[in-house]
Curated annotation (Swiss-Prot):
Gene giving rise to this polypeptide: Lsd-1
Upper taxonomic lineage: Eukaryota, Metazoa, Ecdysozoa, Arthropoda, Hexapoda
Chain's role: Required for normal deposition of neutral lipids in the oocyte.
InterPro entries found in the cross-reference section: Perilipin (IPR004279)
PANTHER family assigned: LIPID STORAGE DROPLETS SURFACE-BINDING PROTEIN 1, PERILIPIN
Protein name: Lipid storage droplets surface-binding protein 1
Keyword Cytoplasm: yes
Amino acid sequence: MATATSGSGLHLEAIDRIGSIPLVESSVKRVETIYDKVKNNNRLFSWYFETAEATISAAYETIQPAVKLFEPSIQRLDNVMCKSLDILEQRIPLVYLPPEMMYWNTKEYMSDHLVRPVLKRADSVKQIGNAVLESPLTTYAAERIDGAFTVGDKFVDKYLVPIQTDQDQTDVKKLVSALNDNFSPIRQQLNRMFGHKSPQEDDNEAVPDERGAIKAIHHGQRFSRKLKRRLTQRTIAEARALKKQSKEAIHVLFYAAELIATDPKQAVQKAKELWVYLSADEPENQARPATLEQLIVLLTRESARRVVHLVNFSAHVAANIPRNLAHTTTEVAHHIIYINHRIITISRLDKVKTISKEEAESLFKRMLAFYGSLQGLTNAYLERVASFLSGRMEAEKVTGSDGGNSNHRSSRRRQDPNHYSATHNNINGVY
């Protein structure tokens, strides 16, 4: 079982036994071959993989001491895996055969147990199918299905009119031939099962001397080919129309860019005309689009019209916002004033209102007086600082009398009470 080798780390017998399985061994060799090819492809890959190998080796050497701690548990796991491999070898010995032998054995087993029973069952189904096809109930159902296909042919001729164009016919023949090549094995298998040949590959002509279920099956095949052919023609025509429309759109864009670069005024005029056209309401009783190109043009035009209407509506709303806001604010203010007046009238708070008004006016007057005195004091100090900085203090010392009178006037100006409700218009000491 599991044995430990000195100097090379822990050795697992289960890994060796799994590697000795032919299928695993061949897979490992194949992977090694691919790895060597990728590694030796160029120098960058070689350096990258060598660095990765060195890193993995260093990591393996680093974790060796930690692995030694779990050696008993790993050995028990190795024993369990070896016992599982013994059971696998006893029950499925095919696993230890070479891959080629496994392939041939599997092929023989599938041939004996799957393919031949299926072929036998298909033969019996063929016989049962012939019996079922000849029953009256099947004949009745086939007639009804054939009638449904006939009605389907009429609808196809009405709504999917063939497009008579040489290039279209060439492309349609190529696509239909490709589709018929894809479905030909199924058709051949059905013909072999029911013992009849396929109908002619014409448009919609029935093969003579047909009846019952075979006639319904062949009619369904013709209807399927016809429907595929008409749908392919219509798809190609719509694709060409879209291609043509795309070219025209690109030409229009180039013309618009050239017009903007050469004549901006005319470009602006064209843009205004287009905007006015798209700003109009959608016309009523429009003709339904007959082709995909017309449908795309209609959807594009109406989508642009919706966008223009949205932009116009947003601009109108944005332009009316200031006026509406002012009107709403005025209305709210009037309502608030009216509500306050009603509350005061109902609560009989007229005296309180008058007292509050007088107190507010008195407080406002005191604030104005304090502000005026503060402004005068500030102006005086600013004048003294300015005089000190300009050297006027020396002049005041020499001319004491003039300075005394000036100081007396300044002190008188500072001590004069403010008997007015409004403040003086004093700015930085200038009166």
